[in-house]
Amino acid sequence: MHEKKGGGYDLRQVQYPLGNWPSIYVMNPGNPQWVNYLSGSINKVYQNLRFDGYHIDQLGHQREAYYVNLKSKKVNGKKVYTDGDRRDTHDFEDYFAKFINRMKADNHNKYLVMNAVSTFGGAKIVGTGNVEFGYNEMWDGDDYLWNYRKIIQDNRYNNGKNTFNTVFAAYLHCRNGNGGQFHTSSALFGNATIFALGGSRIELSGDHMLFTEYFPDNARKMSEKLQESIIHYYDFLVAYENYLRDGNVETSVNMTMDGVNVAAWDLSAPNPSVAEAANQTIGPKPYSVNTYSTTKGDVTMIQLLNYNNVSRDNFNIRDLKETMPEPNVLKNKKIVLDDATSVSRIWVASPDYLGGAPQEVVFSQREGKVSFTLPSLAYWTMVVVEHGNKADSSETEVKNYVLQGESFVEAKDEAVAVGEAYLSFPATVAKTLHASLPLVPVTDGITNVTDNVRTGYYTVSGIKVDKPVKGVYIHNGKKIMGK
């Protein structure tokens, strides 16, 4: 039973309307009879279908109170409910945890995840230790860049493991009334921020990008550029996961770019005296390149996020207004980093440059200052600083090669198509290489053919084959053409 807005009480099964579709019944996860019923139903599913587990969903904080132990009286021969024991809906947060623990106890070998809609019940959910990762669906009051970092850190704290990960559902341009293609810069700035902070994102369903919580809805499309870029971003997320979210500890660095201070992400807690989340000034600084930095062992990871033409009004992920500008791409910027510890190696990588291939950079270190040149910064570039003694006191070099035809050719710029192969060589090897590396040995021709007793057919590379096909072969000391 729930209080009516106009007074009195409403006794009915609460439903969440879905337009022309059947409504969803809203159940009380603290009701033991319902939990027992659902547990039995889930067990039947597991007995007949080989699911690995299931996703538990909720609707967030919908109401302030509900009533149990209802009281009634007869009015004109009809039962009328008049009162009951008022309960706070925040009780549901504890109910969520008990529900998760019950489901895990019933099927300990199955996996669970539960959506903390707008963080409702989030601490209790991840605190069970029985969900595989934090899952947070972000809506209007949550969608602030500083809040994404806070949720990632809160989930790790409440779970008790610094390696605990978080996945966000933040639907791009959700129901803003517009059609057409997604805003590419909105998608890439959002992914750059979430991934750099150590999070992940659920935004793809089949072959399309999500813009509502109804996953089959594919009314909005990705541009060709976004389709290509999104592959680079997810390749990058997987390739460098140990540098992004593997128990790293937050830190801050002092850095200049062409002599101008680079802003460090403000890691402060929200100001409790500021009522509106939109008015918080923590997190990144607008109209600036920002760093978000972590350490692990002797390695410091510096995430450079290029907000140099982004206002605070655009410091959200979903970009309902579709006003996120494209970044001003920065090239060959001189970086000076404060670091008193001996640096052995620096390399950079970006999903926006060379398909994410790592590039070792030349650097010098004097009196606690490390200087190097940053090749490129579009949306996001990661700088990895490794500490320790240098194996070689000479300046470091690196060469990256992109497959073109039957050779790997030294990469000169960032124009790399999706799906191409890359080679990247360390400094000691790079100095010995040429600008082109053929896949097969190159010969100037066949000379000094000597007849011998060996029979069979040999390729020009000296490989014996049983039956020649098209090409040039050596047989009984003579050159022949296979047809």
PLM segments and residue spans:
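Solvent-exposed beta-strand/loop surfaces of large extracellular or lumenal domains
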Residues: 344-370
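Contiguous ligand/interfacial binding patches
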Residues: 346, 389-420
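C-terminal beta-strand-rich structural cap/linker in extracellular carbohydrate-active enzymes
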Residues: 366-388, 418-435
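Surface-exposed beta-strand/loop patches in extracellular or lumenal glycoproteins
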Residues: 310-342
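Active-site-proximal substrate-binding groove within the catalytic cores of carbohydrate-active enzymes
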Residues: 91, 95-137, 142-303, 307-314
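Active-site neighborhood of glycoside hydrolase catalytic domains
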Residues: 28-133, 139-149
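Active-site-adjacent "subsite" loops/lids of carbohydrate-active enzymes
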Residues: 1-49
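C-terminal outer-membrane/trafficking sorting elements
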Residues: 352, 441-483
